[in-house]
């Protein structure tokens, strides 16, 4: 069994991770596969917290461009993340992994309110904690929510799971086949090069709190195990040059 380098992690799952090959919405077999990957590292003793996006159902920024009030559009996006969180929680519990969903919005029928100390206690007891509802504030992305929650729970690393992209490239590898993969970037390099790893607010939070980020392809075999073991995978973003 691989040795664990990161004992407590924050895994950021984009909404795109839930849609599989369907192109929209939630693909249940895909969610089950994600749950099985998470189960694997839980059984290794890793404390796992997750932030989910909602772009497979709703994109607030896109809706705002179509004329919908930005604040309303962003709140709709937060609700989309709750749908994804509930689905993932069910998949994890079917795998025998005790899971709690905490929401930044008040939806007490389906999720606990976000309380930092309670979240940490869940993690210490070996439960997976899914954070839904973003930060609870409009104009804030789920990437920012991931950075914020990771810092609050004192995670060792922020794992940014991507679909079909195995790290950060000099350009979009799907549009530019000649693009090359960065194995390591400093926070400032990621910000200054505008590589769209995550939004500037999220990157700045990681920079200020020296939270390392690993960008990797979730669909790659045992990629989560490699990431938590400190094996070379994807792109590492940290303060070290």
UniProtKB/Swiss-Prot annotation:
Pathway: Pyrimidine metabolism; CTP biosynthesis via de novo pathway; UDP from UMP (UMPK route): step 1/1
Pfam families: AA_kinase (PF00696)
Activity regulation info: Allosterically activated by GTP. Inhibited by UTP.
Annotated positions binding ATP: 12-15, 55, 59, 163, 169, 172
EC class: transferase
Chain segments annotated as coiled-coil in the UniProt record: none
Major location (coarse): cytoplasm
SUPFAM superfamilies for the chain: Carbamate kinase-like
Region Involved in allosteric activation by GTP, residue ranges: 20-25
Swiss-Prot/TrEMBL GO biological process terms: 'de novo' CTP biosynthetic process; UDP biosynthetic process
Domain of life the protein comes from: Bacteria
EC number: 2.7.4.22
Binding site for UMP: 54, 74, 135-142
Compartments in which it is found: Cytoplasm
GO molecular function: ATP binding; UMP kinase activity
Record's catalysed reaction(s): UMP + ATP = UDP + ADP
One Gene Ontology cellular component annotation held by this UniProt entry: cytoplasm
CDD domains, per the entry: AAK_UMPK-PyrH-Ec (cd04254)
Gene3D superfamilies linked: Acetylglutamate kinase-like
UniProt keyword list: Allosteric enzyme, ATP-binding, Cytoplasm, Kinase, Nucleotide-binding, Pyrimidine biosynthesis, Transferase
NCBIfam families referenced in this protein's UniProt entry, alphabetically: pyrH_bact
Protein's job: Catalyzes the reversible phosphorylation of UMP to UDP.
Subunit: Homohexamer.
Family in the record: Belongs to the UMP kinase family.
Protein name as catalogued: Uridylate kinase
Source organism (scientific name): Dehalococcoides mccartyi (strain CBDB1)
